[in-house]
Amino acid sequence: MADVLPRSDGALLRVCRGEPAPVTPVWFMRQAGRALPEYRAARGETPMLQACLDRDLIVELTLQPVRRYRVDAAILFSDITVPLALSGVSLRIEPGVGPVFDQPVRRAADVARIRPLDRGSMTPIVEAVRLLVGELAGIPLIGFAGAPFTLASYLVEGGPSRDHAVTKALMYSDPATWHALLDRLADISREFLLAQIDAGVSVVQVFDSWAGALHPDDYRRYVAPHSGKLLAGLPVPRIHFGVGTGELLPQFRAVGADVVGVDWRVPLDVAARRIGADAVVQGNLDPAVVFAPWPVLEAAVRDVLIRGRAARGHIFNLGHGVLPSTDPGVLAAIVDFVHAWSADRSARGVPTAVDRFGSEHPAAEAAG
């Protein structure tokens, strides 16, 4: 199978390190998912958690979007709740709802029931990573895990929440239990990442999907130490992404991220200015723009690319996951456009943010 996959020119890893690359690398969050007919055929009715522990299915579902889209990276097919299930937490993933927990965690005794993650329970995942590294033949494999706050929110609320009110109530009213919970979750997610790294992933991404619900001061006090513990000293490039986290971008970098993922709400030139010197960013096309006519979509993709040049490095991605009704052909066209546009600019020597916007535009200011 490896002979039908594109060879990596190292663009993604170079950008993660803040080095120049011949093209802007591109991959998509949730690129392995229901937008692909081959995904639907391969997974069938297999429950999500079961699929995430089936070695051969993990391999197949991870490779499908690389074959289809010719992206610059694969991301391991999994779910952020998998290490919780492996740590003895009773949960199920309900279609259209998300993870649902039978026993919410709201007291110190509840935290004590969450076991440390045993690597022995990860055998199918570790074996899948090793097989994938061979199949991908040089294309980077991204591993991932959930950030402590987002996992805690699911556990405390018992499932997805709009306002995270129960989570915040615990955070404010019982900080000892709160910090004990996040400390345990940081250990679990870190072990999950280290097992993937030891098996061969080249990059990791930490998803803090719900951190945007927090005031920056609360993030700094109640969350940042635990995200920092999770990310500290990992021996591969680290991407940190959250939704609605425009006010947290500098802190996402400060807790240990090499690359900061940006959702579609914040222009990348603005994000680069907020993060500061040597910012490397990932994102951030609105996932819904893929349904627009091609001239509109092309203009939006080009705008993301140009704004991304205000940062030291840019990985093109969506600002959140691929929507299930997305046309795979459109994503393939985006990949081709990103590669062609950025290769041409690299060969000719950039049109900079100043060239595109003028010296008074924020993108030009961020570009310095």
From Swiss-Prot:
Keyword annotations from UniProtKB, A to Z: Cytoplasm, Decarboxylase, Lyase, Porphyrin biosynthesis
Lineage: superkingdom: Bacteria
GO molecular function annotations of the record: uroporphyrinogen decarboxylase activity
Positions that bind substrate: R30, Q31, A32, G33, R34, D79, Y154, S209, H320
Enzyme class: lyase
Transition state stabilizer (site feature) positions: D79
InterPro entries, per database record: UROD/MetE-like_sf, Uroporphyrinogen_deCO2ase_HemE, Uroporphyrinogen_deCOase
GO biological processes: protoporphyrinogen IX biosynthetic process
Subcellular localization(s) per the UniProt record: Cytoplasm
Gene Ontology, cellular component aspect: cytosol
Pathway annotation: Porphyrin-containing compound metabolism; protoporphyrin-IX biosynthesis; coproporphyrinogen-III from 5-aminolevulinate: step 4/4
Entry EC no(s): 4.1.1.37
Reaction(s) this enzyme catalyzes, per UniProt: uroporphyrinogen III + 4 H(+) = coproporphyrinogen III + 4 CO2
Subunit comment: Homodimer.
Similarity comment text for this entry: Belongs to the uroporphyrinogen decarboxylase family.
Function as written in the Swiss-Prot or TrEMBL entry: Catalyzes the decarboxylation of four acetate groups of uroporphyrinogen-III to yield coproporphyrinogen-III.
Protein name per Swiss-Prot or TrEMBL: Uroporphyrinogen decarboxylase
